[in-house]
Structures are given as C-alpha cells and as structure tokens.
Amino acid sequence: MLQGFLFLLSVVLLFSSSAAACDRCLHSSKAAYFSSASALSSGACAYGSMATGFFAGHIAAALPSIYKDGSGCGACFQVRCKNPTLCSSKGTTVIVTDLNKTNQTDLVLSSRAFRAMAKPVVGADRDLLKQGIVDIEYRRVPCDYGNKKMNVRVEESSKNPNYLAIKLLYQGGQTEVVAIYIAQVGSSHWSYMTRSHGAVWVTDKVPNGALQFRFVVTAGYDGKMVWSQRVLPANWEAGKSYDAGVQITDIAQEGCDPCDDHIWN
C-alpha cells in the first residue's frame, strides 16, 4: 500500500510540474498584517499558542493554494516588500500557521514579521506598518531548525489507547507531509492516519505498545518515505511532545516561471 501511494504521488507531481524545475518560484502579490495579537493563536493549522514561538513570531496566514487543506501548514517562505524607501532587499522568513480567507492579499503576516521587512533604520518599521497593505515578492524556502529534530505532539483530545491525534512540529526542509502511517514498534502491520484539520492527523485504530511512524513527503518530483522507528512510548500522554528522532531536509521541486535561486541580502 505504501509503495502504491508513492507511485501515485510521483505521477501527480510529474504532471503538475510541466515548467522548468525550480527550488524557488518567485511570486508577486500583496501582504497585510494581523491587527490583533489574539488572531495569531487561533490559526487554521491548529498550532494554538505555540504558533507565536515559531521563528520568533514571524508567522503568516496564506491563501488556499499555499495552505492546501492543511498540508501547507509549517511551510516557510521568504517575503520582502517592494517599497524602495522603506523595505530591505532581504525581507524576512515566515512560517505558515493559518489560512488567509480574503482575496486581497496572498499573505497576512504577524505585525512582527511585517515590521521585519523594513530597512534597519530608525522609524522604518513604524512607517511600514502605517502602509497597512504593501506590494511584496515571496518564495518558498527550506525551514531550518538547526540541530533540532522533528517533534510529534500528542493533542489534548487523544485518549490512550483508543484515540490518537498528533501534529508535527519543527518540520524541516521544503516539503509537505502528504500521508502518515503508524505501527507498533517491531511490527510490519501499518495503518494510515487521517488528516483531521490543519496540521492535525488522527486515528481511532491505535496499535498497542510503543509506536513508530512513516511519513510520506514530497521530495524532488517524487514521494519519499521518512521512517521514524521509535517515537511514542507505550504510555504516551496527551499534551506532550516527543522527539521523532529524524528531520526532513528534502526540497520538493516546483515547476514555474520565473524562478529565483539568488540569495536575498
């Protein structure tokens, strides 16, 4: 079943990438910012209050084509505004934590991320905020968490041993997790988890004992399986995060024009 899924994924990616291979598709649009700090903790990805701790609070709501029914949660983008008087050429990096439901902008940033697009001169960030909505360029970039491994967080709704809900934290690379399989440690009997909403995956068929995971991710133009052999102990608890022991570093190729692989500085 896993092999069949990977083959189907590779076919879909191949036919959806008819343009030249590219790591950094460049997009032009507009960005606004959240005027209320409370909105940052209620994003559709269901990260809750943890969202404000990602990338020093540089987070964003993205349009549906980026959010992708939740598979875009945790994706990283480099974004810069285009006002030559106020904006730096480097911009800032944000992580997707929410769905942008408006059609006025591609991204809605936290005010901290919005200000970080400004030039490093006194008052530039304040003047940028006054603009409200600005023209931007943005591109997908790998999420870099240094030496930190990916974490599996057990949601508060989980009930050992009958129901398990998880979300992935600190997912590196430039990929999307499109499927998750779960099995008892040492077993070859895998069952699939279902994406419930946002970044949350669930199952009511929880194997007994300690648990291992297989994550199917986009990588290059194909699907790749990342195996985390021992993640959750038999006595796993709701509300706790567990080290997955692995990190994703792959880059999923895109097909687009224009492509921008230059360093922004």
From Swiss-Prot:
<dbReference type="InterPro" id="IPR007112">
    <property type="entry name" value="Expansin/allergen_DPBB_dom"/>
</dbReference>
<dbReference type="InterPro" id="IPR036908">
    <property type="entry name" value="RlpA-like_sf"/>
</dbReference>
<dbReference type="GO" id="GO:0009828">
    <property type="term" value="P:plant-type cell wall loosening"/>
</dbReference>
<dbReference type="Pfam" id="PF01357">
    <property type="entry name" value="Expansin_C"/>
</dbReference>
<keyword id="KW-0732">Signal</keyword>
<dbReference type="InterPro" id="IPR036749">
    <property type="entry name" value="Expansin_CBD_sf"/>
</dbReference>
<keyword id="KW-0325">Glycoprotein</keyword>
<dbReference type="InterPro" id="IPR009009">
    <property type="entry name" value="RlpA-like_DPBB"/>
</dbReference>
<dbReference type="InterPro" id="IPR005795">
    <property type="entry name" value="LolPI"/>
</dbReference>
<feature type="glycosylation site" description="N-linked (GlcNAc...) asparagine">
    <location>
        <position position="100"/>
    </location>
</feature>
<keyword id="KW-0964">Secreted</keyword>
<feature type="glycosylation site" description="N-linked (GlcNAc...) asparagine">
    <location>
        <position position="103"/>
    </location>
</feature>
<dbReference type="Pfam" id="PF03330">
    <property type="entry name" value="DPBB_1"/>
</dbReference>
<dbReference type="GO" id="GO:0009653">
    <property type="term" value="P:anatomical structure morphogenesis"/>
</dbReference>
<dbReference type="InterPro" id="IPR007117">
    <property type="entry name" value="Expansin_CBD"/>
</dbReference>
<protein>
    <recommendedName>
        <fullName>Expansin-like A2</fullName>
    </recommendedName>
</protein>
<dbReference type="GO" id="GO:0005576">
    <property type="term" value="C:extracellular region"/>
</dbReference>
<feature type="domain" description="Expansin-like EG45">
    <location>
        <begin position="42"/>
        <end position="148"/>
    </location>
</feature>
<feature type="signal peptide">
    <location>
        <begin position="1"/>
        <end position="21"/>
    </location>
</feature>
<feature type="domain" description="Expansin-like CBD">
    <location>
        <begin position="162"/>
        <end position="244"/>
    </location>
</feature>
<dbReference type="GO" id="GO:0019953">
    <property type="term" value="P:sexual reproduction"/>
</dbReference>
<comment type="similarity">
    <text>Belongs to the expansin family. Expansin-like A subfamily.</text>
</comment>
<dbReference type="InterPro" id="IPR007118">
    <property type="entry name" value="Expan_Lol_pI"/>
</dbReference>
